[in-house]
């Protein structure tokens, strides 16, 4: 009798192929399938040649070649394609079999699929996979959620192929029910947007404000790798700043300043609005990409307004250290806001997400991997009920130490004309979050004035609502239908 596969993978684009090869390297027998079956032969005769990888040429063939309970992982484009493959797979599966979606699916789709497939006796996992092509091949960060009964069967495979911390801990663990895994991956992507934009803002201040050369900036970022800023994105930025093209000039200087996006940052911002979480920095990072896409309009506006950037005066070494502190403090706010969003979703959906374990998932293997994720894990292990990351003693100390320089950098950027939407939004958030009293009292009075939305009073218990007839003409009826 032929040996059967431990897991099947559908989708032989680069991510799918690399995950399969990774699984094979760790001793798992993988059955590979692609809708265009010629790609199966190409894979088996190419990258998979000489391995124990098994080819399948139909979904029926795939199911027949798998050990029970069958485990089938979809590495296909998010959206309708996932549903199409699920429907096509169902006739070939049995009760208790497992389907895993390893794509960048939107978590409401995963919520729906978990429930719908459970009614058919199929266990569904929605798993975020981060790290790109290299991570898939050598160790990604994996964020599984969904039907927890399936986890025991998938866990040995996923934890074996995932990235590992220096202590050997797998950057993969169960996140929570329904779409928790894909939700956490979505927030990961949003934080990635924020991290990248923050680095770009620091780069622009150093380059255009301080007038530093690429050689000088590369040396600065290389030095920052030895601080709390140590991360994959700082690492690759160091490489990028030092990369010369064939003419010997910095290549990045010749790259058009328009940034693309695939939409996951936007998803994070939309969900923050839906959940009522002030995800200001990540949302600004999405808008920064939007502004960058208006290249022709920006050039025209630059000419119309005669926009110039005034050089920053003063000791450059002092300013460089101030920028480092501002970058680090802003990054803390970005992660703090991201975890606030994860917490809110976990509480609303009953996912019971472990926030310290989530930080560990990102410690290696993914784009936002960084040194201080270990400190985030420590903070949540010390206090699982930590609401705001900046309240932890370690991060509070950094924020307090950075605050003066952070303000100087943001204020100076406004003064000289350097856009810093994320650093500015980060410090503005902290100022708002640490304010015992905000001007929302006036805002609520305005709402009551034009819409009779009522208000609470500082001299009365919370939960008691009042309405004022501000003009003498509006009566005393509170609004229950009109809201702003």
From Swiss-Prot:
Which residues does the record give as substrate binding sites?
104, 130-132, 188-189, 193, 262, 289, 447, 453
The record's InterPro entries line, in alphabetical order, gives: 6-PGluconate_DH-like_C_sf (IPR008927), 6PGD_dom2 (IPR013328), 6PGDH_C (IPR006114), 6PGDH_Gnd/GntZ (IPR006113), 6PGDH_NADP-bd (IPR006115), 6PGdom_BS (IPR006184), NAD(P)-bd_dom_sf (IPR036291), Pgluconate_DH (IPR006183)
Q: What GO terms in the biological process aspect are recorded for it?
A: D-gluconate metabolic process; organic acid catabolic process; pentose-phosphate shunt, oxidative branch
Give the Gene3D superfamilies listed for this entry: 6-Phosphogluconate Dehydrogenase, domain 3 (1.20.5.320), N-(1-d-carboxylethyl)-l-norvaline Dehydrogenase, domain 2 (1.10.1040.10), NAD(P)-binding Rossmann-like Domain (3.40.50.720)
User: Could you tell me which SMART domains the record lists for this protein?
Assistant: 6PGD
Q: Where is the active site?
A: 185, 192
Query: Which UniProt keyword terms apply here?
Result: Gluconate utilization, NADP, Oxidoreductase, Pentose shunt
Question: Which GO MF terms does the UniProt record name?
Answer: NADP binding; phosphogluconate dehydrogenase (decarboxylating) activity
- Broad class of enzyme this protein falls into: oxidoreductase
EC number(s) for this protein? 1.1.1.44
What pathway is this protein a component of?
Carbohydrate degradation; pentose phosphate pathway; D-ribulose 5-phosphate from D-glucose 6-phosphate (oxidative stage): step 3/3
Q: Which GO terms describe its cellular component?
A: cytosol
- Which catalysed reactions does the entry list for this protein? 6-phospho-D-gluconate + NADP(+) = D-ribulose 5-phosphate + CO2 + NADPH
**Which residues, if any, are the signal sequence?**
none
Which stretches are transmembrane?
none
Q: Where does NADP(+) bind?
A: 11-16, 34-36, 76-78, 104
- Give the protein family: Belongs to the 6-phosphogluconate dehydrogenase family.
Family matches, as PANTHER family:
6-PHOSPHOGLUCONATE DEHYDROGENASE (PTHR11811)
Q: What does this protein do?
A: Catalyzes the oxidative decarboxylation of 6-phosphogluconate to ribulose 5-phosphate and CO(2), with concomitant reduction of NADP to NADPH.
Q: How does it assemble?
A: Homodimer.
- Protein name per its UniProtKB record: 6-phosphogluconate dehydrogenase, decarboxylating
Q: Which organism is it from?
A: Haemophilus influenzae (strain ATCC 51907 / DSM 11121 / KW20 / Rd)
Q: Which gene encodes it?
A: gnd
């Amino acid at each position: 009798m032929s040996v059967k596969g431990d897991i099947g993978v559908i989708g032989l684009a680069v991510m799918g192929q690399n995950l399969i090869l990774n699984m094979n390297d760790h001793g798992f027998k993988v059955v590979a399938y692609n809708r265009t079956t010629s790609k199966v032969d190409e894979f088996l005769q190419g990258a998979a040649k000489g391995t124990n990888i098994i080819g399948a040429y139909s979904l029926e063939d795939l199911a027949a070649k798998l050990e029970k309970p069958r485990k089938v992982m979809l590495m296909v484009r998010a959206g309708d394609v996932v549903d199409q493959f699920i429907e096509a797979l169902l006739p070939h599966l049995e009760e208790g079999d497992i389907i895993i979606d390893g794509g960048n699916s939107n978590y409401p789709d995963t919520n729906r699929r978990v429930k719908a497939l459970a009614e058919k006796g199929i266990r569904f996992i929605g798993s975020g996979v981060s790290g790109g092509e290299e991570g898939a091949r050598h160790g990604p960060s994996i964020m599984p959620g969904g039907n927890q009964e399936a986890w025991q069967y998938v866990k040995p495979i996923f934890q074996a192929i995932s990235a590992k911390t220096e202590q050997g801990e797998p950057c993969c663990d169960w996140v929570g029910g329904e779409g928790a895994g894909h939700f956490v991956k979505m927030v990961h992507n949003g934080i990635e947007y924020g991290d990248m934009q923050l680095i770009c803002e620091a780069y622009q201040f150093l380059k255009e404000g301080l007038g530093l050369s690429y050689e000088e900036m590369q040396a600065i970022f290389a030095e920052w790798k030895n601080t709390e800023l140590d991360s994959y994105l700082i690492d690759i930025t160091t490489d990028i700043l030092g990369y010369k093209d064939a003419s010997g000039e910095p290549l990045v200087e010749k790259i058009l300043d328009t940034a693309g996006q695939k939409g996951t940052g936007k998803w994070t911002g939309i969900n923050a609005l839906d959940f009522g979480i002030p995800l200001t920095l990540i949302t600004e990072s999405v808008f920064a990409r939007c502004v960058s896409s208006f290249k022709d309009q920006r050039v025209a506006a630059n000419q119309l307004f005669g926009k110039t950037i005034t050089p920053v005066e003063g000791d450059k070494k002092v300013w460089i250290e101030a920028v480092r502190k501002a970058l680090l403090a802003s990054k803390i706010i970005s992660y703090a806001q991201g975890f606030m969003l994860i917490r809110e979703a976990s509480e609303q959906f009953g996912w019971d997400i472990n926030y310290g374990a989530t930080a560990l998932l990102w410690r290696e293997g993914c784009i936002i991997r960084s040194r201080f994720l270990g400190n985030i894990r420590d903070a949540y292990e010390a206090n699982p009920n930590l609401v705001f990351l900046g309240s932890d003693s370690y991060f509070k100390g950094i924020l307090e130490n950075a605050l003066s320089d952070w303000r100087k950098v943001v204020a100076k950027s406004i003064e000289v004309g350097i856009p810093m939407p994320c650093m500015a939004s980060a410090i503005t958030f902290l100022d708002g979050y640490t304010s015992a009293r905000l001007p929302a009292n006036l805002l609520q009075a305005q709402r009551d004035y034009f819409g009779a939305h009522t208000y609470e009073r500082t001299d009365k218990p919370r939960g008691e609502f009042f309405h004022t007839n501000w003009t003498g003409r509006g009566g005393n009826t509170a609004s229950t239908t009109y809201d702003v």
